[in-house]
């Protein structure tokens, strides 16, 4: 076969022209030690704090420690296959997660990957997990109500949009129940809810998701789960992932509600990370910056000013106490960061008062200005009556012969406590709450035994729904009780009193 010089030169020219000059430069390092979700890497001299790293097998990591000769990183995923000597690549990006409407109705893990078996999430928008909270100028004071549907909270510890209200109590006192009821109560409204489960059993998270689905609440809810079986880095980052997703709605002129269940477990995960990274321990072996861990998270919940779009992000963090000790390190930290707390007591819970809210220790520092006028009108008397009842009840234990006025006050107090009880998954709209508290304050319940009050309440709602719907509509729309509306309420309640038999 004859070789022709022109053909050979043609082939060589073609090869030269098609030769790719692209050169990819990536900074890599070598793992020098790994264990418990923490890797120490040598050779990443240019790494940034919080930067995303690429480990073998497609696993991500996040830079936490920058030291002279090595970098400490938390591995965000399964690290069983990663070993010493493996190569780690820098990405040049700060850790980010997917955000947007595509996530609504889904269950995702701590880095935003779907875990509900419903296929991939088609979101092209990503946001950084760690960003600064809005400044003072970008904010507005809380002035719109965030209704929970729970009589005891909406009347005496009201929450506003953009507020941070702590739910605190021992285990098994109904903390998650309060949070889940608040999510269910947003049905038909304009609030997107995010439920972040940190360090919980998978069965518990599955139960919450099935309850939300059953009540049609998953249509406007995102669930972020970092369960007890997952590594400490994932439990540490999950709340930041959740708040990043919430901020997307806040910054797009919408309203969002986020629940962290619970931050005690996040603090424990962070303590584990810090000790493994050899950071010096402080009180209760927590690192010195555990306050900053929670403050930078909760400061991202706020009500934005009209110039910034008037969106809001409301946070309900949950803290679990040990034997009612609210003066421990983490509880006092979070109490000082938030705008109030709902304190749930195990004694009340076991005595049948559910939600088990201790009204004396619970407070809302900014929610009062967000309460509807009608609720404010009836709740002022309610709080006073309950406070007097508790004082009287304490003294009544010592004396047997009580005068008529004291007996009446004790009887009224018992009925108020009874009327504030509420079954789980049954939130009540604002106008019906106002109605029943108005009836209690004005002595309509005094003639009936405490055992008949549940029946009274159910039949009262049915009576107004069927025969006095216009009064309920007026209560809902006016959101204040004027003289004419008060007269209508009194006449309707008098009519109901004649018909009701205990």
Curated annotation (Swiss-Prot):
Its EC number is 7.1.2.2. InterPro entries: ATP_synth_asu-like_sf (IPR023366), ATP_synth_asu_C (IPR000793), ATP_synth_asu_C_sf (IPR038376), ATP_synth_F1_a_nt-bd_dom (IPR033732), ATP_synth_F1_asu (IPR005294), ATPase_a/bsu_AS (IPR020003), ATPase_F1/V1/A1_a/bsu_N (IPR004100), ATPase_F1/V1/A1_a/bsu_N_sf (IPR036121). Keywords: ATP synthesis, ATP-binding, Cell inner membrane, Cell membrane, CF(1), Hydrogen ion transport, Ion transport, Membrane, Nucleotide-binding, Translocase, Transport. The record marks 362 as: Required for activity. This is ATP synthase subunit alpha. GO terms for molecular function: ADP binding; ATP binding; proton-transporting ATP synthase activity, rotational mechanism. F-type ATPases have 2 components, CF(1) - the catalytic core - and CF(0) - the membrane proton channel. CF(1) has five subunits: alpha(3), beta(3), gamma(1), delta(1), epsilon(1). CF(0) has three main subunits: a(1), b(2) and c(9-12). The alpha and beta chains form an alternating ring which encloses part of the gamma chain. CF(1) is attached to CF(0) by a central stalk formed by the gamma and epsilon chains, while a peripheral stalk is formed by the delta and b chains. It is found in: Cell inner membrane. The lineage of its organism: Bacteria, Pseudomonadati, Thermodesulfobacteriota, Desulfuromonadia, Geobacterales. It catalyses: ATP + H2O + 4 H(+)(in) = ADP + phosphate + 5 H(+)(out). Belongs to the ATPase alpha/beta chains family.
């Amino acid at each position: 076969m004859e070789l022709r010089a022109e053909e050979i030169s043609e082939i060589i020219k073609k090869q030269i022209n098609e030769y790719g000059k692209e050169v990819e430069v990536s900074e890599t390092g070598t793992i020098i030690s790994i264990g418990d979700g923490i890797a120490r890497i040598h050779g990443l001299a240019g790494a940034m704090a919080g930067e995303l790293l690429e480990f073998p097998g497609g696993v991500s990591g996040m830079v936490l420690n920058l030291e002279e000769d090595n970098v400490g990183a938390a591995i965000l995923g399964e690290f069983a296959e990663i070993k010493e000597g493996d190569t780690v690549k820098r990405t040049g990006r700060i850790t980010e997660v997917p955000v947007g409407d595509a996530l609504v109705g889904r269950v995702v893990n701590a880095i935003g990957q779907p875990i509900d078996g419903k296929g991939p999430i088609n979101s092209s928008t990503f946001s950084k997990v760690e960003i600064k909270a809005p400044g003072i100028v970008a904010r507005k004071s809380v002035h719109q109500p965030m209704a929970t549907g729970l009589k005891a909270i909406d009347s005496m510890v009201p929450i506003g949009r953009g507020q941070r209200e702590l739910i605190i109590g021992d285990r098994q006192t109904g903390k998650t129940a309060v949070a889940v009821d608040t999510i269910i109560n947003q049905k038909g409204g304009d609030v997107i809810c995010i439920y972040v489960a940190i360090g919980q059993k998978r069965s518990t998270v599955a139960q919450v998701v099935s309850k939300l689905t059953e009540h049609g609440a998953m249509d406007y809810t995102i669930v972020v789960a970092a369960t007890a079986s997952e590594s400490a880095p994932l439990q540490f980052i999950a709340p930041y992932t959740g708040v990043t997703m919430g901020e997307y709605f806040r910054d797009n002129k919408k309203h969002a509600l986020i629940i962290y269940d619970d931050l005690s477990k996040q603090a424990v995960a962070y303590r584990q990370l810090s000790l493994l990274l050899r950071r010096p321990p402080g009180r209760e072996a927590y690192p010195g910056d555990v306050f900053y861990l929670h403050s930078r998270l909760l400061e991202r919940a706020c009500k934005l000013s009209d110039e910034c779009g008037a969106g809001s992000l409301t946070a309900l963090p949950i803290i679990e106490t040990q034997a009612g000790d609210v003066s421990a390190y983490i509880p006092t930290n979070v109490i000082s960061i938030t705008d109030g707390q709902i304190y749930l007591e195990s004694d009340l819970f076991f005595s049948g008062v559910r939600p088990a809210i201790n009204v004396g220790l619970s407070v809302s520092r900014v929610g009062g200005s967000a309460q509807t006028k009608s609720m404010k009108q009836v709740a002022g008397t309610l709080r006073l009556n309950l406070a007097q009842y508790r004082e009287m009840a304490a003294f009544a234990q010592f004396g047997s012969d009580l005068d008529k006025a004291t007996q009446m006050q004790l009887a009224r107090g018992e009925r108020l406590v009874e009327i504030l009880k509420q079954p789980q998954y049954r939130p009540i709209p604002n106008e019906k709450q106002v109605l029943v508290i108005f009836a209690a304050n004005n002595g309509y319940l005094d003639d009936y035994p405490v055992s008949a009050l549940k029946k009274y309440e159910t039949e009262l709602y049915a009576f107004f729904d069927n025969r006095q719907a216009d009064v309920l509509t007026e209560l809902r729309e006016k959101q204040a009780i004027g003289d004419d509306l008060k007269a209508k309420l009194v006449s309707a309640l008098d009519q109901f009193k004649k018909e009701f038999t205990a």
